[in-house]
Amino acid sequence: MSVIPPKFFKIANISIGCIDIIAALSQLTYIFTNLNVFLLAVYGLALSVPIVYLEFKVPSNLYRYASFYFSFLGRGLSYILLSLIISFGGIYNILAGMFTFILGVAFIVFHFSQFVEEPANFRAPGSSLSIGDDDIDDDDDMI
């Protein structure tokens, strides 16, 4: 069903997370000159650190509190928001923001595409169904 291998999503998420962490760290240097950019960098770090962390370990409570990280639409919208947050500063931040924006739009397109299956880390460990899963067990009769 999926033309895109699952390793692509892992590499894309790790690279976008690392690029955005570096961009947010470079914005932290604006603490004395521009407080608004500094605060945007703090929000940028808060959004980009979980992107990298979720590729290695998925905490069980995060499905309940930050479910937008576990769908293409939610992740795409968060990437677009993150691209707007980190795009202040030098040329590196602008390029990182553009790359993040393009990947966010691509993830939104993947959400509405029928041919891309969601990666394994998007599925909750205890749930039998997830978004786009058509394998429903209808053999159980409800009383």
Curated annotation (Swiss-Prot):
<dbReference type="GO" id="GO:0042802">
    <property type="term" value="F:identical protein binding"/>
</dbReference>
<comment type="similarity">
    <text>Belongs to the TVP15 family.</text>
</comment>
<dbReference type="GO" id="GO:0000139">
    <property type="term" value="C:Golgi membrane"/>
</dbReference>
<keyword id="KW-1133">Transmembrane helix</keyword>
<feature type="transmembrane region" description="Helical">
    <location>
        <begin position="11"/>
        <end position="31"/>
    </location>
</feature>
<comment type="subunit">
    <text>Interacts with TVP18.</text>
</comment>
<keyword id="KW-0333">Golgi apparatus</keyword>
<feature type="topological domain" description="Cytoplasmic">
    <location>
        <begin position="57"/>
        <end position="67"/>
    </location>
</feature>
<feature type="topological domain" description="Cytoplasmic">
    <location>
        <begin position="111"/>
        <end position="143"/>
    </location>
</feature>
<keyword id="KW-0472">Membrane</keyword>
<feature type="topological domain" description="Lumenal">
    <location>
        <begin position="32"/>
        <end position="35"/>
    </location>
</feature>
<keyword id="KW-0812">Transmembrane</keyword>
<feature type="transmembrane region" description="Helical">
    <location>
        <begin position="36"/>
        <end position="56"/>
    </location>
</feature>
<feature type="transmembrane region" description="Helical">
    <location>
        <begin position="90"/>
        <end position="110"/>
    </location>
</feature>
<comment type="function">
    <text>Golgi membrane protein involved in vesicular trafficking.</text>
</comment>
<protein>
    <recommendedName>
        <fullName>Golgi apparatus membrane protein TVP15</fullName>
    </recommendedName>
</protein>
<dbReference type="Pfam" id="PF08507">
    <property type="entry name" value="COPI_assoc"/>
</dbReference>
<feature type="topological domain" description="Lumenal">
    <location>
        <position position="89"/>
    </location>
</feature>
<feature type="transmembrane region" description="Helical">
    <location>
        <begin position="68"/>
        <end position="88"/>
    </location>
</feature>
<feature type="topological domain" description="Cytoplasmic">
    <location>
        <begin position="1"/>
        <end position="10"/>
    </location>
</feature>
<dbReference type="GO" id="GO:0016192">
    <property type="term" value="P:vesicle-mediated transport"/>
</dbReference>
<dbReference type="InterPro" id="IPR013714">
    <property type="entry name" value="Golgi_TVP15"/>
</dbReference>
